[in-house]
């Protein structure tokens, strides 16, 4: 009887015990705090000649507080949502246009991206101008006047943990003609490549580093092998943020070597630099210096250069007024390949080869002050700045008919710039801009550029239609020329040819038919002004372009 009583008693209280046990298992209270973190972008710089509207890459991450529960057979894993999980890939972009006078343009980009593995892309760019021109006698010339730029390349990156292994290959080709005289063909190009491994220096809470190697080969396509040149380079950087302090170190090597006619050209550059920065609520600054050992084999100039570095800006909550100060320096190589890409009408002669082999590189020290800001949440933005530049071994281009050569001297300039942008409503924006060279040290050397330019633009930017009109004015230009006279020291004497100031009017309209197709039209230099590339090389007719864009 006693045993039966115990059994009945257990059966009676069992439901209450089980209920308490269930409540004990499910009564789990954990805090869950979703946060939206700063966007993390790939350190991929798009190389596009077309003005493609790039959309920002946004990465959202929801991170709960750390906890672990036994309600499930597996531990709870924090949710992670990335932009790439929902973004539709755009593997193909193509653009083609033709215009009158006869002009052609084309761009092609193929790409693929995997958020866990990496990316790959290939591209091709083309620009050609086949219009008739005018020679030195003022006669119209229709043959041997074409100009063309072509570029092909590829880039790929592999994610290795939090870092990226990246390879970049590209080749350029330029075609010109000396149409002011006999129409001689000018053809040259360059193949280049780069491989790098490291971080993108956006998250400095941990040590970031980057190591890379680069190389290129320049080929003179007319006198094959006479003015060829190669470059090799390597660099390494490390950086870390400690609290609000940033530390960065970098070292590098850059060498250039000529062949045949340029066999005496050898340039070896070694560099080392350091940066220290501080970021606070009101002030951001980065200060440092770079040392360069720049040895040009045929030059007698000192190879030692030290460049200061300073970036400082003051912040406020409204962002309506943000002043800044910048100081830096730069070493610009004056090798034959660099000169040809700057001015393709340089005449390659034995004298030029000898001069280039002994030509020191240009050094410049620059200081900039200014202020900018935006008001009304981006309704109005502006920027005003002044730049003082002190350069040594600066190259001044001078012409002799259809050919160009260079003379070096020191150059001191003061430039003032202003820009303002107004967005009264979401789809409209208006822009005005102006720049002036307020001072330059020389009266007998001329920089072949306007002393001032001003411009204004109006744009309408909606999802279906984009349209714009711009009007620019550039002042008269003094083009440096070689005089028949010589100085008392037997040095060449220079003069100038002055060309008038020019107004240029441009109009563009684009209609997006659907998500894949768009058509556009552009009017360039509708005023028919003489727009000079260099003295005696110009275009003076209005241009019209019709094109189509396709995105897959």
Q: What function would you assign to each model-found segment?
A:
Residues 19-84:
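N-terminal periplasmic/intermembrane-space "pro-region" immediately following the signal or transit peptide
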Residues 89, 115-119, 158-164, 204-206, ...:
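Strand-connecting loop/turn motifs
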């Amino acid at each position: 009887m006693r045993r039966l009583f115990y059994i009945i008693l257990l059966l009676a209280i069992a439901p209450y015990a089980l209920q308490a046990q269930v409540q004990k298992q499910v009564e789990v209270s954990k805090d869950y705090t979703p946060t939206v973190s700063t966007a993390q972008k790939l350190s991929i710089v798009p190389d596009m000649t077309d003005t493609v509207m790039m959309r920002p890459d946004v990465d959202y991450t929801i991170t709960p507080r750390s906890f672990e529960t036994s309600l499930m057979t597996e531990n709870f894993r924090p949710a992670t949502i990335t932009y790439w999980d929902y973004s539709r890939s755009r593997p193909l972009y193509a653009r083609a246009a033709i215009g009158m006078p006869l002009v052609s343009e084309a761009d092609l980009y193929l790409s693929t991206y995997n958020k866990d593995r990496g990316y790959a892309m290939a591209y091709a760019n083309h620009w050609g101008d086949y219009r008739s021109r005018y020679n030195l006698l003022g006669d119209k010339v229709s043959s041997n006047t074409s100009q063309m730029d072509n570029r092909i390349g590829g880039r790929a990156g592999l994610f290795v943990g939090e870092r990226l292994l990246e390879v970049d290959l590209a080749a350029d080709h330029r075609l010109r003609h000396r149409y002011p005289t006999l129409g001689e063909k000018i053809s040259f190009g360059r193949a280049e490549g780069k491989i790098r491994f490291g971080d993108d220096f956006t998250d400095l809470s941990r040590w970031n580093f980057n190591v890379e190697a680069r190389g290129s080969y320049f080929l003179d396509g007319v006198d094959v092998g006479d003015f060829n040149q190669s470059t090799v380079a390597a660099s390494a950087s490390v950086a870390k943020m400690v609290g609000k302090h940033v530390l960065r170190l970098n070292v590098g090597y850059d060498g250039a070597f000529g062949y045949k006619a340029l066999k005496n050209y050898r340039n070896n550059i070694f560099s080392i630099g350091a940066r220290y920065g501080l970021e606070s609520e009101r002030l951001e600054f980065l200060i440092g210096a770079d040392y360069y050992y720049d040895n040009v084999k045929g030059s007698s100039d000192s190879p030692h250069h030290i460049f200061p570095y300073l970036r400082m800006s003051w912040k406020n909550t409204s962002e309506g007024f943000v002043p800044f100060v910048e100081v830096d320096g730069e070493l610009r190589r004056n090798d034959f390949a660099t000169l040809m890409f700057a001015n393709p009408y340089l005449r390659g002669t034995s004298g030029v080869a000898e001069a280039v082999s002994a030509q020191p590189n240009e050094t410049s020290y620059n200081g900039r002050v200014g202020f900018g800001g935006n008001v009304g949440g981006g309704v109005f933005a502006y920027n005003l700045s002044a730049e003082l530049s002190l350069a040594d071994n600066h190259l001044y281009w001078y012409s002799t008919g259809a050919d160009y050569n260079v003379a070096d001297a020191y150059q001191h300039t003061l430039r003032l710039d202003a820009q303002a942008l107004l967005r009264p409503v979401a789809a409209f924006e208006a822009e005005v801009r102006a720049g002036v060279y307020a001072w330059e040290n020389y009266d007998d050397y001329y920089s072949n550029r306007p002393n001032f330019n001003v411009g204004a633009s109006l744009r309408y930017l909606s999802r279906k239609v984009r349209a714009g009109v711009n009007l620019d004015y550039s002042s008269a230009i003094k083009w440096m020329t070689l005089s028949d006279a010589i100085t008392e020291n037997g040095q060449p004497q220079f003069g100038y040819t002055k060309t008038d100031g020019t107004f240029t009017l441009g109009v563009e309209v684009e209609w997006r038919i659907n998500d894949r197709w768009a058509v556009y039209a552009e009017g360039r230099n509708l005023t028919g002004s003489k727009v000079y590339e260099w003295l005696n090389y110009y275009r003076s007719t209005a241009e019209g372009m019709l094109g189509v864009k396709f995105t897959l």
